[in-house]
Amino acid sequence: MLRSAGRVAAVALLALFALGCVSAAAKPSTDRLVAAIKSKNLSAVVDALSVKGLDVNTPDSTRRLPLVEAARSRDARLVGALLDQGALARVSDGTTTPLHLSMQGGSAAIVKLLLAHGADPNAKDKTGASARSTAAAVKELADLLKQWDARGAMAFEDEPGAWIREERDGQSYYWKPANGESRWAVPPSCAWQRVTVQGHPIKYINSLTGQETTRVPPALAWARVTAADGSALWLNWASRVASAAATAPAELPAELAAELAMHPNRRWYNTATREYVYTDPAYATPWRELVDEASGAPFFFNVETGDTTWELPAALAWTEVIESSSGADGESGSGSEAGPRYFHNTVSGEVAWSAPEGSRHVFVEASAADL
């Protein structure tokens, strides 16, 4: 009886294993896709990409990666088609990367596409050479690298508001009204997330390109405002574009969009520069006050330099002082009024008669009537 039960269990396990093998074997191959890429047949590539369940980051039966072969073809249309379907720009076949091939070939259009999707010009190939070191002597490539060095992948993102997100078959679908471009994979400008962890400074991470920043990226620089005629608008204060759409901009994650919608018309006036800002004055300096998890004591972290200190930084040490004026007889009476107003830095000892630029005192929260 026990032998019979064991035999049945073994047969069942073998059946499950066989099903697993069939399932694995049934996974769509990229052989047809790579063949279409090698022949530079765009319509065949589009047809191969339409196969349900296809993973464009899977090598074919001869270990060739679709995006590497597309870069080798020097056809920007093929590279763009793969990136639109979720191909990873940072991929490597163990020998080279798409960016190495495009840099060597002087293909500026492809290089821009790859950098925009997270390719790293400092990544190395099998020989240890970085992609930037193999670049052909082409001015356009030098300009692209200069932009990347200054701002990273976000230098090549679409302008905020360029994409519209819709739901189709339970999936997010993106299209760009300006040129009719459409894609299922999230565009780089729509892949930003705000990351908040207790005891750590807020940071922003692009889930597609991997770029991180402690400052609000242009893609997320949206505010909910009320126009002069009373209509509600989404305003991108970084790029100075507005959207009258009822739905939140495609760049905003749902949680952040809901938070902004709850606090419409919130902004601050900088009395020094005479400009309005939409970011909390608490972030006017790179210093953030955090709490040490072990001791519970406060400490300060500089998001730009990475420095930490237990002492209050001078940039945060400005206090406003208002002296009371005394009466004509030199005594302060019950009817005394506010006297001279100045600012004192408790760390550096400096004194200023006007609110120091960069301190929280220079900002005044604006009312809705100021809009």
Curated annotation (Swiss-Prot):
It is found in: Endoplasmic reticulum lumen. Residues 1-24 form the signal peptide. The keyword Repeat applies. ANK repeats lie at residues 62-91, 94-123. One of its GO terms (cellular component) is endoplasmic reticulum lumen. Keywords: ANK repeat, Endoplasmic reticulum, Glycoprotein, Repeat, Signal. It comes from the Eukaryota. Residues 159-187, 283-313 form the WW domain. Glycans are attached at residue 41. The keyword DNA-binding does not apply. Gene3D superfamilies: 2.20.70.10, Ankyrin repeat-containing domain. It holds the Pfam family WW. One of its GO terms (biological process) is cell development. PROSITE patterns: ANK_REP_REGION (PS50297), ANK_REPEAT (PS50088), WW_DOMAIN_1 (PS01159), WW_DOMAIN_2 (PS50020). May have a role in the remodeling of the endoplasmic reticulum upon zygote formation. This is Zygote-specific protein 3. The lineage of its organism: Eukaryota, Viridiplantae, Chlorophyta, core chlorophytes, Chlorophyceae. The gene is ZYS3.
